[in-house]
Amino acid sequence: MGNFQKEYGESELIDTYLNIAVAETLKELRKEYNYSYSELANKLTKKVSRQTLNNYELGKSKLRMDMFMEFAKVYHLTPKELYEKINMKYISKLSQYTEEITKKEK
């Protein structure tokens, strides 16, 4: 993750880690439920392409609130539960980044 610091400013770096946390959480949930992109797309009430789902999981597309609610519903989670999963991943990513910086400063 050290390369992000070269490419982004500090405020954008925080946003980048949040985007990574969202992407990884969505990918983990899809795999946990053994859904292909096509199966997941069929379960969502809002029509999205497999490519859009892939972009969410790669962090190339930011998740809008309506899609956040859709994913929570498909994975049988309350919005709060999905938020907490993402938040835990985000905290983990920031902790890793902080450890990297601390090691470099020593």
Q: Where do the protein language model's features map onto the residues?
A:
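A short, Lys/Arg-rich alpha-helix, primarily the initiator
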Residues: 2-33
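DNA major-groove recognition helix of helix-turn-helix/homeodomain DNA-binding modules
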Residues: 1, 66-81
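Conserved hydrophobic/aromatic packing and binding residues within compact polymer-binding modules
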Residues: 26, 40-41, 53-56, 82
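Short basic helix-loop element that most often maps to the first helix and adjoining turn
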Residues: 24-45, 70, 104
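Short, charged recognition helix plus adjacent turn
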Residues: 7-8, 13-16, 73, 83-106
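Recognition helix of helix-turn-helix/homeodomain-like DNA-binding domains
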Residues: 44-62
